[in-house]
Amino acid sequence: FDENKAYKALLEAKEEGKIKYIGITSHSLETIEKSIEDEKFSTIQFPYNIIEDQADEVFKKANKKDIGIIVMKPLAGGAIDDAKLAIKYILSKDYIDVVIPGMESIEQVRENVSVLQDTNITKDDELKIQEIRNIMGKRFCRRCEYCLPCPLKINIPQNFLLEGYYARYNLKDWAKERYKSLEVKASACVEC
């Protein structure tokens, strides 16, 4: 991060009293781990939810270093329907400071805030969480790139990402346009 002009500008703004904290957001666990080791950031923001919980140990490490933890994608980009359970799951972790779910209505705000009344996970919640993991676990792309390299050079995570924009976010035209620009389409898959 030393050579990064943006980081230097943020340091300068902090020294001038224009900002209080510098945080980092990433979808790469490796980047988050490095930022914790470097101790240059006051907060980290990373996707975390019932089916994407690979950051647990990294979050605990950050918490021990007094680095704030902000969770994004608590509903896995809309893949998890039960918002209350998803937020409750995250808030039950004492090493997580903030969860930022997307909301489109006052009713969703009320529903999300109501979770704060009780963040303890019950046996029934645990069963629901396991059910979500069983259903989503095998078909949810975590962008880990374990599926790469594809012998046919299909960018598998990118295809899943576009499918999500098409199906969950209803950005059909946007997703189709980007899909057309892919060098190798998912339709070329031979299921090897």
Question: Would you name each region that the model predicts?
Answer:
Residues 38, 56-192:
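Structured C-terminal cap/extension of enzyme domains
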Residues 1-70, 75-78:
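Glycine/proline-rich, positively charged
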